């Protein structure tokens, strides 16, 4: 893991993250113009960072937040589509992989159901190699239709990459899912605003440490007339230490080199802090000393997760018993979310 140079090598993946200014757009013409602006920025960045293998743009950077529902549906894109064609051409020209936001992607039942909040990973040949739909939209504000799974794809120089989006990153389960699928770099694209800056910076660092993985965060910056976005895009080592972090500046960039061999060596040879190994080999020192084998205990000790898998409805009821049983809150209503208990059919 190295920071401060503009290069990369056969063993290091040069990763850049961007504090893209949150755009305020209203139609597809504006979206496509902004997509071309992102493409031009990517190509320019390659001149300044010749070692750049991967560039990451934030959530909402392509379309902005459509606060008008009609505009949200009217600007929802297809994948592949006009937006991705612009990004693919830029990846080919810059000979660089890119991660881009599509908010939203048309639902299969468009326009009868809300769009998805989607990220795409495009390789340096212009091919889409991963499409991830946000599993945990930022309720109660975001009205995206939720996705249902994470992915791992082989990225530049063989580094294994997973994508997550913004509020996803507040749930340790999604990081663990990516790591246990083999992700070595988890990319968190976000359009996060104040007041939650300190919490979000802390969360990404903690999850890098807890999952023995690299983390790249690209966040929006600026003010779009509604929210103030705090930037602080960052690249974090698999030991939880920040390699490089922007401030709040619009279009700020950070860059670091992520060693492929270093993370694989750490996962194979680290012991006391090898969290993903130890989770499935619980107490192996004591188990071995007892003569009960040399693999520790693999069984899941967490009753809630067992319940969630075997009876999701009962798990939901348990959560409601310690929180609330309606999605809306009577003292602070958001939209038309119900604040009185309804019967599910």
UniProtKB/Swiss-Prot annotation:
Q: Which reaction does it catalyse?
A: a monocarboxylic acid amide + H2O = a monocarboxylate + NH4(+)
Q: Which residues form the signal peptide?
A: none
Keyword Membrane assigned: no
CN hydrolase domain span: 13-260
InterPro entries registered for this protein in UniProt: Aliph_Amidase/BUP, Aliphatic_amidase, C-N_Hydrolase, C-N_Hydrolase_sf
Keyword Hydrolase assigned to the entry: answer is yes
| Source taxon at top rank | Bacteria
MF terms in GO = amidase activity
Q: Catalytic center at which residues?
A: 59, 134, 166
Might you give the EC number(s) for this enzyme? 3.5.1.4
Q: Which UniProt keywords apply?
A: Hydrolase
Q: Which NCBIfam families match?
A: PRK13286.1
Protein family: Belongs to the carbon-nitrogen hydrolase superfamily. Aliphatic amidase family.
| Primary role | Catalyzes the hydrolysis of short-chain aliphatic amides to their corresponding organic acids with release of ammonia.
Q: What is this protein called?
A: Aliphatic amidase
Query: Native species of this protein?
Result: Rhodococcus erythropolis (strain PR4 / NBRC 100887)
